[in-house]
Amino acid sequence: WGDGNPEGVRQRAAEEMKNTARAARRFFNAAPPEIKQQLTRIVVNGFTGSSIWQYLYAFPPTPPDLIERGFQDFATRWKPILDVFEQEDVYFALEVHPTEIAFDIVTAERAIEAVNGHPRFGFNYDPSHLGYQGVDYVAFIRRFRDRIFHMHVKDVWWSSVPRLSGVFGGHLNFGDSRRYWDFRSPGRGCINFEEIIRALNEIGYRGPLSVEWEDNGMDREHGAREACQFVRQLDFEPSRLSFEAAFER
């Protein structure tokens, strides 16, 4: 695999991803029937990496063809991986995240285009990586309604007034009071989870509401209990009847 050689390591990582799809299929096949019935699809969450992650901030000016080559490189490496996911009837969900090939709505659309709309490529929806950037995180759900394969209930706080550091964090550790934004226990940040649940119900999402918890200012065990209670209170089934239909005899 050319250990120590970057390209050899990339090839080994690609094979690892293919084997992950195969393993996910085998885990599903071995699961009890009651577990299988709860799953709408088999999903592997993860990151794709990006050969252009260092150009997140477009200065010095970044030539458009350099960015295009980055998306082409992503497609060249990931289409064969996604083909194995298709063979195994498994879906790959990229967590849209700064320094990944997709980090907002525009780059998520471009990533889909790069792999020619591959049916096994979609997203692990995590609003905490979108809100503080200024991205419309509820619109993301509706925009990619057929590609939301998984989601994280993860909250983030961002300031309503200027701070000593900005979106890029000022090289400050998480939990530092000088930050412009920071992760919070679900329900204690700025994310509007009410609108998220309504949008997920609207698109027919039936997957898990998976808590990813980070909060430097809170005890973890307290946070785990609180997050569980928050999600149970938050979630609800969509209406099966329109408002107008309720008046029909």
Region spans (language model):
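Short, acidic/polar
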Residues: 12-23, 133-142, 193-196
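Acidic/histidine-rich catalytic cores of soluble enzymes
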Residues: 68-190, 239, 243, 247
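Flexible loop residues that form catalytic
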Residues: 49, 156, 213-214
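Active-site acidic/histidine proton-transfer and metal-coordination neighborhood
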Residues: 1-123, 221
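A short, acidic, flexible beta-alpha connecting loop/helix-capping segment that sits on the rim
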Residues: 210-219
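C-terminal helical cap(s) of enzyme catalytic domains, especially alpha/beta-barrels
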Residues: 220-240, 247
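A short, acidic, amphipathic alpha-helical segment used as a generic capping/interface helix at domain edges
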Residues: 188-202
